[in-house]
Amino acid sequence: MWRVCKLCRSAAIQMTSNLPETTSKLEGPLVKQFSVFLPNKVGAMLEVVKLLSVQNTHVVALSVSESTDSAIARIIASDPTRVEKLFREKNVPFGVSQVVVVELREVATQLVKLLAALVMAEVNVHFAYPLLIRPRGFAAIALHVDDTECASSVLMGEGFKLLSQDDITR
């Protein structure tokens, strides 16, 4: 069942041929996140990071969640095309999804504003994690949400700077 967020639905009803600036599209693609399925053993994460490092591809963001037998490493990399090709060649089990990456100039106040905007738009955050780099000198957070288009539109409308894959590629 498809769901349209409350704010995006009301914005769509009010839209005319003159689109407001807040509905503009991001320059460049959204950010690709790789979910890598790893055995829960010592050194498994190191193997993946070394595989990328040898190919001069940098881990830009990382989050790991574990269970008894396995772990899922969520990775944002500097060159997603190379990563996808490499994972396929080396038979690394993975999935790909899109995340919204938001720059936070003042984390203490902006994080509350960001989450409140998503709640008002009825956008669910599945998980979030910080970037390891500061692409433009500020903190940034990756958000896996149930509606990337609505989240992007709402956050841009609230004045947040969204980062594209081009912004984080080194």
Could you describe each region identified by the protein language model?
Residues W2-C5, R9-R170:
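A conserved regulatory-domain signal marking ACT and ACT-like small-molecule sensing domains
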